[in-house]
Structure formats: C-alpha cells, structure tokens
Amino acid sequence: MKHVFSGFQTFLKQVHSPIYLALAVVIFSAANPVTSRIIELGKTYEINGRNPISFCNVLFVGNLCALGLMILIFHPDWQLHKLRKLTRKDWFLLTVTAILSRAIAPGLMFSALEKTNVTNVVLIGRLEPVFTLILSILLLKISVNWLSMVATLISFVGVAVTVFWGVADPLDMVINFDFGLGESFVAIAAFISAITTILSKQQLQSIPVGIFTVYRSLLGTFVFFWIAVIIYGFDHFMDVSSPILWRWMLIYGAIIVVVGQVAWLAGLKNASFIQINLASLVTPILAIIFAYLILLETPTNAQYLGGILLLLGAILSFIDNLKTAKDKQASKPLNSREAMDTNVGFRGV
C-alpha cells in the first residue's frame, strides 16, 4: 500500500501545472451550476416541507470540507514562532478580510443564486476586477495605462447591458435603486471581494500563506454560521445532519472543494503569469456553458451582448497584462498570495 501511495505521489508531481490549472478551471466553472442543481434535487427530499440541501447548509458544510483540506495542506505554517511574528494590526486585518471574504461575500453569492440565474451571477460577478482597479487607483494611487482603462470601461458597460437591457426606464431604475435582489447581491459581493483583495495586497503580504488561508476559512465559517443563526435562528440548520445532505456533500466536497482546491494549488506552484491570467479569462466563459448544459439556462439577448462586451474587456485586460509585465515575471511563478487571490469566480466555497 505504501509503495502504491508513493507511486501515486510521484505521478502527481510529474503532471504539468497547466493540466492542474485546466482541471481547476473546469471544476470552478461548474461550481455555480452544480450548486444550483444539487439544491434543486434537494427539493425531492424535503423534510416536513424543508429542503435539507439548502443554500446555507451547502455553504456551511462545504466550508467545513474546505477547512479540513486547508488544515491538512497548511498546518506546517501554524507554528508558535510564526504566529508570534504577527502584530495586532495583522490579526485585525486578517479578521476583517476573513469576515468579508469568507462569510459575507459567499453568503451574498449563495443568496443571489436563489434570486437570479447562474448566467447573471457569472456576468455581474465580473464587476470584481473593475472594482479592484478603481479602488487601486483611489486607495493605492497606482497608475494605469489607457488600455487598462478601456478594458475596465468595456467590462462595466457589459455588466450594465446585462442589467439594464430591455428595461423601460433605466434612469428611474438607478435613481430608485430598483435592481433585482439577486443582481444587487452579486454586485455587493463583488465590491466586498475587491476590498479584501486591496487589503490583502496592501497589508497582508508578509503573513505566511498557510496562516492567511486557514484563519480566513476558520473564522469565515464560524461567523457565517452565527450570522445565519442570528437572522434565521438555530432551526435554520436543523437539517444539517441529514444523511441526504451529507451524501451529496461528500460528492460536492470531494470534487468541487477538494479536487478543485488541490488542483488549483498544485497548478499555482509552477504556473506562469500568463497561465494564471488565462485561467481568469476562460472561467466565466466555461461557467456560462456549464449553466446551459447542467441547468438548461439559455442566455437572453442582454446576456449575450453583455457577455460579448465582458469577454472583449477581459481579452483587452489580458493583453494589457502581457504588455506591462516584465519578461522575467512572465516566465516565473507569481507571488503565492497574488496567485491564490486571482479572480476565477466562485470556487465552490
């Protein structure tokens, strides 16, 4: 058995980074449609009128699966001498980013899936890099070139087309903030994710990636649970031990969470700047395709046009990244923190 396990490890090490990245991208792209489909299936197993595979149950149990995986991978970073190096400011910012990125933002994304279709969630979620660039200019005072600005503007127009196309009075809709609840949740989640990205880049680069990742997952799961309890009561999680929930979550956790996260981390180990940016570019396209294949969601005219504009913006952004990156940066791995925070949309947790 030991020989077989050792041979399997050797085989995994021989697999090239692009293959791992491609596998992770496919899994992450399918995460939203698969989540929605599993929750739909849960309606056939209702317990006294309650769906045991609810969004909150899936998010909570999925996060527990992810947390277990992160602890196995990153436990060497949790050594006392490393923890003592963190200042009070580090712990405070870690706590803020954990609550925002691992409790509030995912909760909003899951709530959005209840209110609108997956295609809208994917397209409007592309606001995150737009918000990140704007906040970087305002808060970090970074300089941007014209191509980056054009890419951002086109992406923003693409989201606007998705939301406003076919609306009789778009101006009145904006003034009264009369957006769809699901669409609003996605936009707010994108803004929150952008804030955490800025905080991570500005203040948390010196913190070991293992401490950063495990602490975010642990605190985020804890805070999400108590937010849900405060809003809905303990009864909201009364079906969390349901066998049917765990049966599906073992599949979901094994494929979407474990295989997806392991493939992503393995791919990042030796991935180049270009490969990671390509992953970010391809993911939303595949997500829309999976929404059609798994949920039979046919994009509307607004989604087609908005998606084309978003794709154009993403391509221009990719070209800009290639032009501005130094040759040596394009051929070596990214900083581990920057790589892990690459925007590839919802990752299942």
Swiss-Prot record:
UniProt keyword annotations, A-Z: Cell membrane, Membrane, Repeat, Transmembrane, Transmembrane helix, Transport
SUPFAM superfamilies associated with the record: Multidrug resistance efflux transporter EmrE
Compartment list: Cell membrane
Organism for this UniProt entry: Synechocystis sp. (strain ATCC 27184 / PCC 6803 / Kazusa)
One matching Pfam family: EamA
Family listed: Belongs to the EamA transporter family.
GO cellular component: membrane; plasma membrane
Protein name: Uncharacterized transporter sll1164
All copies of domain EamA, residue ranges: 39-164, 191-319
Topology class, membrane: Multi-pass membrane protein
InterPro entries according to UniProt: AA-Vitamin_Transporters (IPR050638), EamA_dom (IPR000620)
Spans through the membrane: 15-35, 53-73, 91-111, 120-140, 147-167, 179-199, 218-238, 248-268, 276-296, 302-322
